[in-house]
UniProtKB/Swiss-Prot annotation:
Transmembrane segments: none
Membership in a protein family: Belongs to the eIF-3 subunit F family.
Keywords annotated in UniProt: Cytoplasm, Initiation factor, Protein biosynthesis
Subcellular compartments: Cytoplasm
Name of the protein in question: Eukaryotic translation initiation factor 3 subunit F-1
Xref: Pfam families: JAB (PF01398), MitMem_reg (PF13012)
Biological function: Component of the eukaryotic translation initiation factor 3 (eIF-3) complex, which is involved in protein synthesis of a specialized repertoire of mRNAs and, together with other initiation factors, stimulates binding of mRNA and methionyl-tRNAi to the 40S ribosome. The eIF-3 complex specifically targets and initiates translation of a subset of mRNAs involved in cell proliferation.
Keyword hit for Coiled coil: no
Keyword Protein biosynthesis: yes
Organism: Drosophila willistoni (Fruit fly)
First-listed, main subcellular location of the protein, grouped into a coarse class: cytoplasm
Quaternary structure note: Component of the eukaryotic translation initiation factor 3 (eIF-3) complex. The eIF-3 complex interacts with pix.
GO biological process: antibacterial innate immune response; defense response to Gram-negative bacterium; formation of cytoplasmic translation initiation complex; positive regulation of Notch signaling pathway; positive regulation of peptidoglycan recognition protein signaling pathway
GO MF term list: metal-dependent deubiquitinase activity; translation initiation factor activity; translation initiation factor binding
Length: 280
């Protein structure tokens, strides 16, 4: 498969590790680089982990601790044997002159390595994320070179990662003095209420976007339109009475599960107290 047909999917933990490595960099380091770990399947490069590689960049050369990178990879293989080298990352919003030299090393470690750049300067208030592959250029018998070509990149996450991100969002904007050290699990009904409130706010946002497009206040985006059409087609066709009946049945089932779980919890607590009662 051609390298240009690859798509990169990056997990949140990778971005957290990149930012952490950037914050811990040496004072004389302008950027940080590291190894990307993950898997490749059917043209999709899924990046699930990474680590930093110490290096120094000079005007005419790059010094990287390759032995450190090899040791880190071997240690990671003992814990996550399904993760392999898929490319490398660097902080910044552009490809530098030294990028081709670093890419040559990773080209020996894996087939079609990808290069991901993370803009930790937060230009425009966003963390820019880009992915590249290196395409060989040249003529037979002449000089050859390479060119970094952008490829699609997107963020993805497993369900536990999504849940963790939602918990982190609750502490955004909270001062350290008032920030809770622990986040207790929410009750089932509280989770339903919170999810319903968020769904209502998202629906209001979509309706506002559609109204602005109809009023020619916003330039329409074909990709957004196709996604909205897919959402409409995904909604099951049923009457209001059928939906109400189905919703009420699910709520009754949920309440029954909550009641039974509370009874089991009470029984376990009572059994624990009876077990530790002093015997005459």
């Amino acid at each position: 498969m051609s390298a240009l047909n690859l798509t990169v999917r990056v997990h949140p933990v990778v971005l957290f590790q990149v930012v952490d490595a950037f914050e811990r960099r040496n004072a004389d380091s302008h950027r940080v680089i590291g190894t990307l770990l993950g898997s490749v399947d059917k043209g999709v490069v899924e990046v699930t982990n990474c680590f930093c590689v110490p290096h120094k960049e000079h005007d005419d050369q790059v010094e990287a601790e390759l032995s450190y990178a090899l040791d880190m990879y071997e240690l990671n293989r003992k814990v996550n044997s399904n993760e392999s080298v898929v490319g490398w990352w660097a902080t910044g919003n552009e490809v530098t002159n030294h990028s081709s030299v670093i890419h040559e090393y990773y080209a020996r470690e894996c087939n079609n390595p990808v290069h991901v750049t993370v803009d930790t300067s937060l230009q425009g208030g966003r963390m820019g994320l880009r992915a590249y592959v290196c395409i060989q250029l040249g003529v037979p018998g002449g000089k050859s070179g390479c060119m970094f070509t952008p490829i699609p990149v997107e963020l993805t996450s497993y369900e536990p990662e999504t849940f963790g991100l939602k918990l982190l969002q609750k502490t955004v904007g909270v001062s350290p003095a008032h920030r809770p050290k622990t986040v207790p699990p929410m009750l089932d009904l509280a989770q339903i209420s919170e999810a319903s409130t968020k769904l209502q706010s998202l629906l209001d946002l979509i309706l506002k976007y559609v109204d602005d497009v109809i009023a020619h206040k916003v330039t329409p985006d074909n990709a957004v339109g196709r996604q909205l059409l897919d959402l409409i087609h995904a909604v099951p066709h049923m009457t209001h009475e059928q939906f109400t009946q189905m919703f009420n049945a699910n709520v009754r089932d949920l309440l029954m599960v909550i009641t039974l779980s509370q009874l089991i919890k009470t029984q376990l607590q009572l059994n624990e107290k009876l077990t530790f009662l002093p015997t005459a």
